[in-house]
């Protein structure tokens, strides 16, 4: 054991000599370069101005940077190692300094210093696009990934950053259709079925953030725009138009019908109802072409349909009445979708439905001097072309085979249903032309007469001034025709015999006779008038309704029309109140007068607040409107408002004065009716005269004997009874005192008849010492409205016969008691 242990030192010595180049004794004595730290950590973007490390360099040695050092990253100043650059993790995450310790040119020792660059969040994420457009089909299934993550992913130079994605809608409600599959996985998926008609395109904003939360620092965000276009899908079948019902998604197809004559083959396509056979692609954005075909019901191949336009034509005639139910199919050109509907064609006999014109006599007009080829205008409606048409009632298909020609004149020719001049019209006259209509299928013919008036063009009235009184305005003028027939455009007349027909808007009728001056006044400068007349026994013109305006003052150099009425009523009706009736003509305008009718009935005077215009035959309806102040008005709206305020104040003062006068003259009656009548009747008394508070204050007079004739005496303390032989209504002044007759009440003798006046006496006598009965006399000739005066008068003596005769007369009539009580309480007041 001891011998091997002694051999180890002798064996290790040569190896140490080779490794260190010198014996172990000299290693302990030699010093080399050294550093106290070889690895450093520095955050990126940090500038280090202090030396990283101090190098220990023994005497006789020096240090330099070796070739293995990071270029330009370090420098050595003396014995200090400095960082020469600002580190950037994205450029170089590890910096190396190779320090060589040399003795002369020989390297004694090599030192390595490392700088690890720490990453910080200093870079924002980036998308590979700013705006990207994607197309999504309308029939894409829900939860399908429409855009993969690789096309939407953003990148960040900060390798350790985790990006968070957010999808924000720009188009309202777009977020209901699309969403991201995850906050860190930006794949786009479909959440709801698309509708091309509602959302043809949607826009989103895609955000990528390099922090989980938004409010931390530092935090960076990148944005990009996504545009999603919805592509239409072939989801709907062809639609036969017009749809009976449609909401844009579903169409209830139209069903067609037609009527054809038996025994005839129509050369042109059938006229279908409600319209021609026509189908469109239900997906309007795709709009595939449609191909038509008949799949059933075409007995004996009677009909054929055009595959491209759907026109249905006959291949042969139908011998007898029958009905065809054709099934029409419409296919898309790509044969992906189709629809079916039915067309019912009924064959009827044309017998009993001859070819005929709408009227036997037409009225046309041509302007004098018209060139050849000028269309004849309708005389009733001169702004419209006269159309002469012959038809088969109930067979519209036969009408297309009708041709027209002029049979008796070379001055006119027919272009379909329009008559044209063949030569210039150089003479004013009236021409009657015969037109023949013939059907090329049935060979039927019909004739009609056209009366054409060649006349000069009438001057068009100037339109009314803006804001002024609105008058009849027109673009063309015409005379009032008296036609026996009707034109193509029906002219309506009211049942009451009112004028008609009415021309359309834009025409005005002008009277054929010159206007006369205004009756009862001097004519205004530049004005003319037109009389408004009625025929014998004439019908009445219609009454203007309240609130309407019937102006009689058109603008300059125009004349109002005559209004002639037919015969059924007795007088023209009076315009109702509430409408304005301007009767002052504007200079250069015309007014109208209203003479009495020949039948003795006269037009009534228009009521205040109405205005009325006149016209002949077919009249144009004048337009009304709230006019502003025109050139011919004298006062502005402000002036009229001030005038209205002044008139209102005057009316208020007049009402106040009237109330004062009524109160002054009738207050005693008002006080009687309102104050006395409402007082409660006292209980326990038949007559208010015997109440203690209202007892008479006079002294009793001695009884006197009756005298044959009354004599004048001193006026009594209380007024005597005003009754006389002839009752008279009361006056506003109190009755004058009358001389009192001696004796019983002989003062009331009316008409010298005992039945003219009757006496009503009460049972009760006055207290002893006052004497007398209480009596009231009523005349039979006094009406209910006459006033009665109740007089309490003391008498000296009363005849026993009068007292006994009136004993019980007052008991049986309580109404009379009430009358007596009221009269006594009023004290000589008329009741």
Curated annotation (Swiss-Prot):
Region named Mediates interaction with USH1C and MYO7B and is required for proper localization to microvilli tips and function in microvilli organization: 663-831
Subcellular location per the Swiss-Prot or TrEMBL entry: Apical cell membrane; Cell projection, Microvillus membrane
GO cellular-component term (any): microvillus membrane
Basic and acidic residues composition-biased segments: 761-771
Keywords linked to the UniProt accession: Calcium, Cell membrane, Cell projection, Differentiation, Glycoprotein, Membrane, Phosphoprotein, Repeat, Signal, Transmembrane, Transmembrane helix
Bilayer topology: Single-pass type I membrane protein
Gene Ontology terms: biological process: cell adhesion; cell differentiation; homophilic cell adhesion via plasma membrane adhesion molecules; intermicrovillar adhesion; regulation of microvillus length
Chain positions found as Phosphothreonine: 728, 795
Highest taxon in the source lineage: Eukaryota
Biased composition (Pro residues): 716-738
Signal sequence extent: 1-28
Residues modified as Phosphoserine: 699, 721, 725, 736, 753, 802, 804, 806
InterPro entries: Cadherin, Cadherin-like_dom, Cadherin-like_sf, Cadherin_CS
Positions of region (3 X 31 AA approximate tandem repeats): 541-614
Sequence repeat segments: 541-571, 572-602, 605-614
Glycosites: 36, 45, 84, 135, 143, 173, 201, 287, 311, 408, 475
Record field: compositional bias (Low complexity): 505-540, 555-572, 797-807
Extent of Polar residues compositional bias: 473-491, 541-554, 573-582, 589-623
Keyword Phosphoprotein applies: yes
Keyword Phosphoprotein applies: yes
Function field: Intermicrovillar adhesion molecule that forms, via its extracellular domain, calcium-dependent heterophilic complexes with CDHR2 on adjacent microvilli. Thereby, controls the packing of microvilli at the apical membrane of epithelial cells. Through its cytoplasmic domain, interacts with microvillus cytoplasmic proteins to form the intermicrovillar adhesion complex/IMAC. This complex plays a central role in microvilli and epithelial brush border differentiation.
Protein name: Cadherin-related family member 5
